[in-house]
């Protein structure tokens, strides 16, 4: 993989500050399947004030205002959500290229992903585990944690490095989440436990969503991991 790839298509990004007013700490926010860059922007007032947020739109249009990072299919028998390797690889490499293009403007870069956006955030972490101050992973999953797909095995060749570095990850999910299946939760938990410095919180009564309590924990976590300077 090229260490400094150039993204073929510049993504649509909603920034919390205009270019001349951006702070030195960047938080990249990645929405879930069927949403867009505005979906999580309501979190901005509840996040640490010294962080600049870049909410990125996923590249695959589903319908007006609705996008995905890669296609998802549903098993007709089990209902399990799945995906094929190549679209995942293309999406992760394109987003990684954009991050590489903008990261030089900031002192720190952190990630926040919800649902399919969590899959993307943890995938970015697997490509470059030293690059991120922390990752906030909400109500989602880790892509192919057992590296069963050859094309993804090639992409995530640094998983052993991730386990050595132990990057900081906050993983929050709802106990009543109907979208992410229990087997997917279990394999995600196993991968995170084996590879990262994990803070895990399960929220009783919460579905596939973010509640006020979780948002407070996210704010505290980011403030601790990315402290204000000066």
Indicate residue ranges for each PLM-predicted region.
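Short beta-strand immediately N-terminal to the catalytic nucleophile in serine-hydrolase-like folds
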Residues: 111-113, 138
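Short beta-strand/loop motif that positions the catalytic acidic residue
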Residues: 165, 170-173, 177
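C-terminal catalytic histidine-bearing segment of alpha/beta-hydrolase fold enzymes
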Residues: 183-230
């Amino acid at each position: 993989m090229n260490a400094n790839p150039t993204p073929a298509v510049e993504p649509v990004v909603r920034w919390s500050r205009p270019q001349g007013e951006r702070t030195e700490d960047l938080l990249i926010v990645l929405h879930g399947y069927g949403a867009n860059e505005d979906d999580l922007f309501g979190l901005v007032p509840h996040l640490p004030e010294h962080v600049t947020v870049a909410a990125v739109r996923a590249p695959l249009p589903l319908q007006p205002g609705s996008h995905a990072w890669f296609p998802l299919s549903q098993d007709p028998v089990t209902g399990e959500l799945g995906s094929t390797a190549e679209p995942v690889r293309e999406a992760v490499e394109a987003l990684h290229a954009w991050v590489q293009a903008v990261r030089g403007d900031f002192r720190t870069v952190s990630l926040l992903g919800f649902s399919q956006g969590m899959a993307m955030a943890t995938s970015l972490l697997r490509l470059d585990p030293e690059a991120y101050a922390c990752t906030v992973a909400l109500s989602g999953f880790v892509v192919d944690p057992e590296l069963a797909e050859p094309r993804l095995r090639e992409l995530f060749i640094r998983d052993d490095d991730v386990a050595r570095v132990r990057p900081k990850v906050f993983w929050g999910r709802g106990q009543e989440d109907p979208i992410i299946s229990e087997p997917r939760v279990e394999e995600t938990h196993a991968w995170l436990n084996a590879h990262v410095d994990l803070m895990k919180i399960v929220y009783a009564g919460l579905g596939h969503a973010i509640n006020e309590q979780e948002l407070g924990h996210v704010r505290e976590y980011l403030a601790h991991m990315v402290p204000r300077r000066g």
